């Protein structure tokens, strides 16, 4: 059963943070790469701390072993310096898919008692 084995590692490019540069009066999009470096198929989901400012497309999916996906992280226009951006980040959550499951994302993979791993990518805003 896949859930008894902890999910393996993923890699992200960039590896530690996402940087957006001013001006912030227009929407910015930054692409990141998520790589399943484990030997098992995983399901992933992306969360953001500020859903009205930050978006991710696609927000979830399934990756086979060694497979990668590009995600578009977008930052909508906002009043820089007038809004709190200190805790902005995106979080990649992933878990092993059940053995024999179709390659189609299912939210319930994250709601059972299986192990879910997380990687936080803080957002940095350059003035």
UniProtKB/Swiss-Prot annotation:
Localization, per the record, is: Cell projection, Pseudopodium; Cytoplasm, Cytoskeleton
Q: Organism's domain of life?
A: Eukaryota
Positions of post-translational N-acetylalanine modification: 2
Key word Nucleotide-binding present:
no
> A Pfam family matched by this chain, by name?
Motile_Sperm
What are the residue boundaries of the MSP domain, all occurrences included? Answer: 9-126
Keyword Acetylation on entry: yes
* Matches recorded under InterPro entries: Ig-like_fold, MSP_dom, Nematode_MSP, PapD-like_sf
Show the PROSITE patterns listed in the entry: MSP
Q: Name one GO cellular component term.
A: cytoskeleton
As a miscellaneous remark, the entry gives:
Around 30 MSP isoforms may exist in C.elegans.
Summarizing the function annotation, the protein's role is: Central component in molecular interactions underlying sperm crawling. Forms an extensive filament system that extends from sperm villipoda, along the leading edge of the pseudopod.
Protein name in the entry? Major sperm protein 33
């Amino acid at each position: 059963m896949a859930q008894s084995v902890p999910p393996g590692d993923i890699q992200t490019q960039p590896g530690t943070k996402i940087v957006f540069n001013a001006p912030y009066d227009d929407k910015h999009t930054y692409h990141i790469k998520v790589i399943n470096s484990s030997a098992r198929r995983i399901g992933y989901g992306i969360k953001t701390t500020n859903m009205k400012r930050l978006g991710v497309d696609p927000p979830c999916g399934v990756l086979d072993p060694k497979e990668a996906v590009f995600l578009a992280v977008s930052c909508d226009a906002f009043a820089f310096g007038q809004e709190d951006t200190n805790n902005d980040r995106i979080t990649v959550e992933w878990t092993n898919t059940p053995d024999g499951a179709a390659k189609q994302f299912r939210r319930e993979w994250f709601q059972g008692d299986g192990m879910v791993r997380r990687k936080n990518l803080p957002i940095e805003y350059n003035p």
